[in-house]
């Protein structure tokens, strides 16, 4: 069901340890039976995330490409996305029927954003463990991503995080933009994210 405009490109960003790779894995497994899916991962000096997705059997290895960004990973998704665009072009050439390509950024900060030339839809992932105040700190990832995922909700009692406070702050900071609480370890929230991609991405 390939679009005339090419595959839907979904950018997945967030700080180190927030659960980006776990989310990418769950989305691939949830969507691969209905759609033709591929992944591009970004790491500074390795292709570790790509290798992890292969080990997790998220997709066949020929559908997963790891790029080494070197230096600052933010540049490869924003100011100069050439390396990622080339990786997507290579996937399109090898797999002409692609419906969705997930682009997982390297670990970044709250100011990181995806170039509109690279991603059609952006998902930003934060972890409950990173502090109760993270949603209200703002930054483009929090305020402007198409979907905010607040992950590891199951750990809230152990790190002293109040989910009601996070809910209130996310609602205030994002205005009408959607957000989801998730627990990727158990798969909680994945179906809501898939539904969002289907609706907003026209799948």
From Swiss-Prot:
Residues at which GTP binds: 14-21
Entry's localization field: Cytoplasm
Kindly list the GO molecular function terms attached to this UniProt entry: GTP binding; GTPase activity; nickel cation binding
Report the principal subcellular site: cytoplasm
Task: Tell me which InterPro entries the record gives.
Answer: CobW/HypB/UreG_nucleotide-bd (IPR003495), P-loop_NTPase (IPR027417), UreG (IPR004400)
For this UniProt record, the keywords arranged alphabetically read as follows: Chaperone, Cytoplasm, GTP-binding, Nickel insertion, Nucleotide-binding
Pfam families (alphabetical): cobW (PF02492)
Instruction: Supply one GO CC term from the record.
Output: cytoplasm
List GO BP terms, alphabetically.
Answer: urea catabolic process
Superkingdom to which the source organism belongs: Bacteria
The protein's assembly and partners: Homodimer. UreD, UreF and UreG form a complex that acts as a GTP-hydrolysis-dependent molecular chaperone, activating the urease apoprotein by helping to assemble the nickel containing metallocenter of UreC. The UreE protein probably delivers the nickel.
Per the entry, what this protein does is:
Facilitates the functional incorporation of the urease nickel metallocenter. This process requires GTP hydrolysis, probably effectuated by UreG.
Family classification? Belongs to the SIMIBI class G3E GTPase family. UreG subfamily.
Q: What is this protein called?
A: Urease accessory protein UreG
Name the species this protein comes from: Rhizobium leguminosarum bv. viciae
Q: Which gene is transcribed and translated to give this protein?
A: ureG
């Amino acid at each position: 069901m390939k679009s005339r405009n090419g595959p839907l490109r979904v950018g997945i960003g967030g700080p180190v340890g927030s659960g980006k790779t776990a989310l990418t894995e769950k989305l691939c497994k949830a969507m691969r039976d209905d759609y033709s899916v591929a992944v591009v991962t970004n790491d500074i000096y390795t292709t570790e995330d790509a290798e992890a997705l292969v080990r997790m059997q998220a997709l066949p290895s020929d559908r997963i490409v790891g790029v080494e960004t070197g230096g600052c990973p933010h540049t490869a998704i924003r100011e100069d996305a050439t390396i990622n665009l080339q990786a997507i072009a290579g996937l399109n050439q090898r797999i002409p029927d692609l419906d969705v390509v997930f682009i997982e950024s390297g670990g970044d900060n709250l100011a990181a954003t995806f170039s509109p030339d690279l991603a059609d839809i952006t998902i930003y992932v934060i972890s409950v463990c990173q502090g109760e105040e993270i949603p209200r700190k703002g930054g483009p990832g929090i305020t402007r991503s198409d979907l905010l995922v607040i992950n590891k909700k199951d750990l809230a009692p152990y790190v002293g995080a109040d989910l009601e406070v996070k809910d209130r702050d996310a609602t205030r900071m994002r205005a009408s933009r959607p957000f989801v609480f998730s627990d990727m370890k158990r798969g909680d929230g994945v179906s809501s994210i898939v539904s969002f991609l289907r609706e907003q991405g026209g799948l």
